[in-house]
From Swiss-Prot:
First-tier enzyme category under EC: transferase
GO cellular component terms, A-Z: cytosol
Reaction(s) catalysed (UniProt annotation): L-methionyl-tRNA(fMet) + (6R)-10-formyltetrahydrofolate = N-formyl-L-methionyl-tRNA(fMet) + (6S)-5,6,7,8-tetrahydrofolate + H(+)
Keyword flag DNA damage: no
Gene3D superfamilies: 3.40.50.12230
E.C. number(s) listed in UniProt: 2.1.2.9
Species in which this protein is naturally found: Geotalea uraniireducens (strain Rf4) (Geobacter uraniireducens)
Entry-linked CDD domains: FMT_core_Met-tRNA-FMT_N, Met_tRNA_FMT_C
Protein name: Methionyl-tRNA formyltransferase
Disulfide cysteine pairs (residue numbers): none
Length: 313
């Protein structure tokens, strides 16, 4: 099985360590397929996906179809005669006509311990849900949403203060290692496929900005998990005096008060009452202001005890 012709499909930063691992191993990556360049940031400057940047740095041909399922795109992929397609956070559903092309199928690197957290945002939802362990699963793709046979699993603990960004960075490397192990087993003829138990699954849908609105009637740990799971995007938030207050890092405490009311505001942070305790906001950003540690923010912006955080009026 030496010299497999591999097509890599991926788009964001999460996919880059796996592509780099393939290149470091000397695999024959014949093409990279990624999403089109898109406007990003406040200036809406059109930027290439990170995977495209990495591929071009190594002289690999890049395709950027608007829709990978259209017949002419499928046929252009077929003409490349890949033995294997590796998919990491590509961002489009692959049709059966494409899945059937490579001799050894299409292998996906998914950022959860399947069958838990199928879907687009597994990193966020496992943290929001308060889980203490997650990982990466490689799987043989089928036409369902993350329903294919599992191949290799790598687990890792989730730190109590870890947010989605740091978990993303760690799992991107774990995913690359899991894919390398999967290829070694495939090459040796020792790859074992394990069916997923649909009864054990849960879904991780794409997040929307409004999902980050904090409900102060929840318990401290629930709110902390939401903040961790929403950082860096789409961000947890509340409103203070009609202005959006983005909240990036919090601790839990045992303060008492009406949910959403400010208990104290000082160098240690902004303490806000919730159900069964309180939240100490440690890092925040008020609408129109810079992101700051709470102590630095409060040195120049006074918030009186009794002030209310909540929904926009």
């Amino acid at each position: 099985m030496a010299g497999m012709r591999i097509i890599f499909m991926g788009t964001p930063e999460f996919a880059c360590p796996t592509l780099q691992k393939l290149l470091d191993r000397g695999e024959d990556v014949i093409a990279v397929i990624t999403q089109p360049d898109r406007p990003k940031g406040r200036g809406q400057q059109t930027l290439p996906p990170p995977v495209k940047v990495l591929a071009e740095r190594h002289g690999i041909p890049v395709m950027q179809p608007l829709k990978v399922r259209v017949p002419e795109v499928v046929e252009s992929i077929r003409s490349l005669a890949p033995d294997l397609i590796v998919v990491v956070a590509f961002g489009q559903i692959l049709p059966k006509s494409l899945l059937d092309i490579p001799k050894y199928g299409c292998i996906n690197v998914h950022a959860s311990l399947l069958p838990r957290w199928r879907g687009a945002a597994p990193l966020n939802w496992c943290i929001i849900n308060g889980e203490t362990e997650t990982g990466v699963t490689t799987m043989m793709m089928d036409v369902g949403l993350d329903t294919g046979d599992m191949l290799v699993k790598r687990s890792t603990p989730i730190d109590p203060d870890e947010n989605t960004q740091s978990l993303h960075d760690r799992l991107s490397v774990v995913g690359a290692e899991a894919l390398a192990e999967t290829l070694d087993l495939l090459t040796a003829g020792k790859l074992v496929r394990e069916k997923q138990d649909d009864a054990l699954t849960c879904y991780a849908p794409m997040l929307k900005k409004e999902d980050g609105l904090i409900d102060w009637s929840k318990e401290p740990q629930t709110i902390k998990n939401l903040v961790r799971g929403m950082t860096p995007w789409p961000g947890a938030f509340s409103f203070l005096d009609g202005k959006m207050l983005k909240i990036y890092r919090v601790g839990t405490a045992g303060g008492e008060g009406t949910p959403g009311s400010v208990i104290r505001a000082g160098r240690e942070g902004l303490e806000v009452a919730c159900s069964g305790g309180s939240i100490v906001i440690e890092e925040l950003q008020l609408e129109g202001k810079k992101r700051l540690h709470a102590g630095d923010f409060l040195a120049g912006y006074k918030i009186a005890p009794g002030s209310i955080l909540g929904k926009k009026d």
